[in-house]
Amino acid sequence: MSRGPEEVNRLTENTYRNVVEQFNPGLRNLINLGKNYEKAVNAMILAGKAYYDGVAKIGEIATGSPVSTELGHVLIEISSTHKKLNETLDENFKKFHKEIIHELEKKTELDVKYMNATLKRYQAEHRNKLDSLEKSQAELKKIRRKSQGGRNALKYEHKEIEYVETVTSRQSEIQKFIADGCKEALLEEKRRFCFLVDKHCSFASHIHRYHLQSAELLNSKLPRWQETCCDATKVPEKIMNMIEEIKTPISTPVSGTPQPSPMTERSKMIGKDYDTLSKYSPKMPPAPSVKAYTSPLIDMFNNPATAGQSAEKTNNSTANTGDDPSLQRSVSVATGLNMMKKQKVKTIFPHTAGNNKTLLSFAQGDVLTLLIPEEKDGWLYGEHDTTKVRGWFPSSYTKLLEENMKEAMSVPTPSSAPVRSISTVDLTEKSSVVIPPPDYLECLSMGATSDKRADAAKIPSTSTFKAPVPRPDATSTSPSDSNGTAKPPFLSGENPFATVKLRPTVTNDRSAPIIR
């Protein structure tokens, strides 16, 4: 492809301008990016060192395990190997800074000045040569005009030949200058790209050597590392022997073998009965989270003798329940009412469930079967005998059915353990209870407990109990209470209820019993 001198000259100037305006600014940007690259690699090396320090710490933990000791040593070795590779990488990147970044910084500043000066020098020489050629061409034109119309044609012809030779030689010089300048400009450009490639090839050789060393090091250790973790269920032989010894108990003489506890068979039978009952027990929804509300008309069903004292009993019931929680129940386990036969209750107030599907609706006088005999926060769970619908309902809206009460009276108390008073009859309301005579003290223990004294002291002085007629052999002097009245013998700390015959009671809301 042939090009004219002017086109080649433009190529030369453009080459110099590309080096000055594009290559050198690109090198400056490359230097900044290289510095960022160095920072990132240094941060990666530091992060890797911290990471593999953590791996080594976990390996130290594993070395304390009887089955993972070898794995712990492998983790420590992996940590040290990778830290060594990171140190080698750090050394290679120090060469990256020294051979590339530092050299580029040094060359770029000098090269900008050099290329600007070279371009200006080329342009100046090219302009001088063009001026000389143009001057010679102008002289040649003058001589040719003179030789055409003058007398001395031979004289001007000789000068014309000389100027033609001068113009021709100067044109050759310009063409040679343009060609040499273009070649020099292209070579200057190539030298700069070659320098950049050479520096990166040198760094690549260092990285290649680093990767070869890393591959050789990892290939020598990786199979052994993988072998230690190929089977996670493998247990060392020493540990297996220990486990087998634990599995195989040492034989003991027959005489030393303990006999099974008699409570074991009882527990098995109880558990079997419980499983049978739980298998056929109804699946019920959870009890309502709110406390069951008490009927506002509940006092209407109390005895007339106690109807006037409902407010006082409500206040006293709160204080009494704090002393002994077992007195809250009107029907205890000892009465036999909590046996497996399902109890029935009769509703005394209507109840509407509303939008709550877990509650049971009923009218006054309906009969319900209790599926769960125990109350939960004032709620009972049962089934309507007519509609066969199940749900929760307030216990204060029902009372025990008559037939259930008769059965409860006929069931004997099977408990052999000492049972405290089961009835929650308010003793202040009973004026017909007869106090036993003082000779009852003979069958009692001489050391009365302090809690019995406290219970006796809680009985108000206005009690309607009839004081017993003192026997002649009784103590003539009896202590007096605070208001000056004679203190009955049973208030001296003895049990006043041992001979009291209690009536069966039915409690609707656990606050006021109904005396039958």
From Swiss-Prot:
The answer to whether keyword Lipid metabolism applies is: no
Query: Which stretches are annotated as coiled coil?
Result: 115-148
Phosphoserine: modified positions: S261, S281, S332, S415, S421, S423
Record-linked Pfam families: IMD (PF08397), SH3_9 (PF14604)
Q: Point out residues bearing the modification Phosphothreonine.
A: T248, T257, T413
UniProt domain IMD: residue ranges: 1-249
The protein's matches in InterPro entries, at most eight in alphabetical order, are given as: AH/BAR_dom_sf, Baiap2l1_I-BAR_dom, I-BAR_dom, IRSp53/IRTKS/Pinkbar, IRTKS_SH3, SH3-like_dom_sf, SH3_domain
Q: What is its subcellular localisation?
A: Cytoplasm, Cytoskeleton
Question: Polar residues bias located where?
Answer: 474-485
Q: Name one GO biological process term.
A: plasma membrane organization
Q: Where is the stretch described as Disordered?
A: 303-328, 454-516
- Fetch the SUPFAM superfamilies from UniProt: BAR/IMD domain-like, SH3-domain
For this record, the Gene Ontology CC terms, alphabetical, are:
actin cytoskeleton; cytosol; nucleoplasm
Alphabetically sorted, this entry's keywords are: Actin-binding, Coiled coil, Cytoplasm, Cytoskeleton, Phosphoprotein, SH3 domain
Every copy of the SH3 domain together lies at 340-403
Q: Does the keyword Ion transport apply?
A: no
In its record, the post-translational modification comment is: Phosphorylated on tyrosine in response to insulin.
Where in this protein does the record put region Binds F-actin? 488-516
Q: Which CDD domains match?
A: I-BAR_IMD_BAIAP2L1 (cd07645), SH3_BAIAP2L1 (cd11913)
The GO terms describing molecular function are: actin binding; proline-rich region binding
**What does the UniProt entry state concerning the protein's domains?**
The IMD domain is predicted to have a helical structure. It may induce actin bundling and filopodia formation.
Role played:
May function as adapter protein. Involved in the formation of clusters of actin bundles. Plays a role in the reorganization of the actin cytoskeleton in response to bacterial infection.
> Subunit comment for this entry?
Interacts with RAC1. Binds to F-actin. Interacts with FASLG.
Put simply, this protein is called: BAR/IMD domain-containing adapter protein 2-like 1
Origin species? Rattus norvegicus
Q: Which gene encodes it?
A: Baiap2l1
